[in-house]
Amino acid sequence: MPDFARLRAKRLFLLDLDGTLYLDERLFDGAADFLRAIRSRGGTYRFLTNNSSRGAESYVEKLRRLGVEAETSDFLTSVDALVAHLHAQGMAEKLLYVCGTQSMKRQLTQAGLRLTDDRDAAVDALVMGFDTELTFQKLEDACILLNRGADYLATNPDWVCPTWYGFVPDCGSVCEMLFRATGRRPYVIGKPRPDMAHLAMVHGGFSAEETVLLGDRLYTDIACGVNAGIDTVLVLSGETKEADLAGSAVQPTFVLGSVAEYLSILQE
């Protein structure tokens, strides 16, 4: 019998978005009530997303459109983790060529980082994001820079991004394509690395024992929680199905059908 009392005792809830709380423009049943229940119990939640294609402001707009009140301070993205990593590694002054959306580039520029779209400039590092504005020219530039020996970072390893009609290639798939062309693999910043989870705990002043991470992907969300040393909840509302657990080296602490099931546990 799962120890649901352990889930009721959590104070910091780290939540994935796509496939966990909503899918495209459809908020999952119970999601809004789950968020309200966390705060009514004196808890805190932070949304963690590997999606670098948009900033926190657009996520706030989306959640409000879906009926959920949110502020930019409720979010930590893979771009936030990238900025923290570059500063920690002494790379804040490096010149970056970013394969990413205009929104991602704007976030990096606002963080004080130096960007260029010129592959012939003295580029120090190539940064790959989930680029919904990807062109073949960007791919060609990336190959040229990698063959020249530029440092190589990526915001996330996700193979696909869920949509209402299925999936589209995400950052990980594009990085795999570049590997086939150049033999280079990136240093990956977002989940499954524990950086975002650690940032959320430090900013909020919460311990690992007080924290739980919820997500729908074993290889990013759940692995992030495992790497951060916190309890994890796999929800079966997104990419991962129950049959996938048997062949996975990464295992969650708990498996629930959806956030609505966690809501029921909180209400017991």
Predicted regions and their residues:
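Conserved phosphate/oxyanion-binding catalytic-loop motifs
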Residues: 51
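N-terminal phosphate-binding loop and flanking beta/alpha elements of the actin-like ATPase fold
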Residues: 44
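Asp-based, Mg2+/Mn2+-dependent phosphohydrolase catalytic module
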Residues: 1-15, 23-41, 54-76, 83-268
